[in-house]
């Protein structure tokens, strides 16, 4: 309730009613949630918490946080550190997963394929927190190659982002490679592959030229759908590595009970998710001429 939010923000349960009421008035929480029966006409609906705090989000007017800071300005400032981490992680992770899964498919029914699948299952079974802690222990404490955490501008950004990117790529390799391996194995059983082999093409050419090209359609649509969400950052990685992105911004808002920020980030994430789905449908029609909108 707004009263609980006020007590949490002020600090403590033994807060005077006047202090609680003052906090609610300053932040617009002194009004009813959906319907204000004390008003007349349109004001019954406009003089409410929902209208004044949620409806402006439709025009991407995020307003101010409960501490009085401009949320829109914070999002613009924190968007770039999130992208600096998310874009290389996404590109490198996808490329490495494709190469690794193709190698497993090339050596299918061999010991290499078997142990590769075992490694993938083990990797996807381990929590991402383990990779973060292990990476900080190995590369920062033992080898002293990169800092534990932090962020800086310019070329110094590389040394602060190197460890988070490596950890994120390794953490997602197991699940992505396992999925892509199944996708490539399904393609190998199709008629065009048998036709290519009957023409005398080598297994390497069949796999890397024909199978990969035809399997790129679902990979492309999945990648395009994920692109808008890169702006949202990573909650865990940014918090552990001290990166001032949108992920850590959201997590700090949750821990600080700043529901204005949480509301804005949920709306932004939902909007980007919808944009991603639309982009995936469009890319599907562009990549496959047989598919058309009706």
Question: Which residues are covered by each model-predicted region?
Answer:
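Hydrophobic alpha-helical transmembrane segments of membrane transport/permease proteins
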Residues: 1-45, 143-160
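Generic structural marker for isolated residues within well-ordered, non-membrane alpha-helices
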Residues: 6, 20, 119, 136, ...
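Membrane-water interface segments at the C-terminal ends of transmembrane alpha-helices
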Residues: 1-2, 118-147, 167-172, 178
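Hydrophobic alpha-helical segments of integral membrane proteins
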Residues: 19, 23, 27, 46-62, ...
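Alpha-helical transmembrane segments of integral membrane proteins
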Residues: 79-112, 128, 152-294
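Hydrophobic aliphatic residues
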Residues: 1, 9, 13-14, 27, ...
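An internal, D/E-rich "acidic patch" concept
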Residues: 32-98
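Short, hydrophobic secondary-structure boundary micro-motifs
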Residues: 7, 33-35, 62-66, 132, ...
């Amino acid at each position: 309730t707004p009263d609980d939010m006020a007590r949490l923000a002020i600090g403590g349960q033994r807060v005077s009613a006047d202090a609680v009421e003052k906090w609610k008035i300053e932040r617009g929480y002194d009004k009813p949630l959906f319907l204000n029966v004390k008003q007349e006409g349109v004001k019954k609906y406009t003089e409410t918490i929902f209208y004044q705090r949620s409806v402006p989000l439709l025009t991407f007017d995020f307003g101010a946080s409960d501490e009085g800071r401009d949320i829109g300005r914070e999002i613009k400032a924190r968007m770039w550190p999130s992208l600096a981490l998310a874009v290389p992680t996404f590109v490198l992770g996808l490329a490495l997963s494709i190469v690794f899964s193709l190698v497993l498919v090339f050596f299918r029914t061999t010991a290499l394929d078997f142990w590769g699948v075992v490694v993938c299952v083990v990797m996807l079974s381990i929590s991402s927190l383990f990779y973060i802690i292990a990476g900080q222990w190995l590369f920062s404490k033992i080898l002293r190659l990169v800092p534990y955490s932090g962020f800086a501008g310019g070329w110094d950004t590389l040394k602060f982002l190197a460890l988070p990117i490596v950890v994120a790529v390794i953490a997602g390799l197991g699940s992505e490679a396992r999925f892509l391996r199944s996708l490539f194995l399904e393609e190998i059983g199709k008629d065009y592959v048998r036709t290519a082999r009957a023409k005398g093409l080598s297994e390497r050419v069949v796999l890397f030229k024909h199978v990969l090209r035809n399997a790129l359609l679902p990979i492309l649509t999945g990648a395009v759908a994920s692109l808008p969400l890169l702006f949202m950052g990573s909650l865990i990685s940014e918090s552990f590595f001290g990166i001032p992105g949108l992920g850590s911004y959201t997590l700090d808002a949750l821990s600080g009970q700043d529901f204005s920020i949480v509301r804005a980030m949920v709306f932004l994430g939902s909007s980007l998710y919808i944009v991603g789905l639309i982009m995936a449908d469009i890319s599907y029609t562009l990549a496959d001429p047989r598919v058309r909108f009706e």
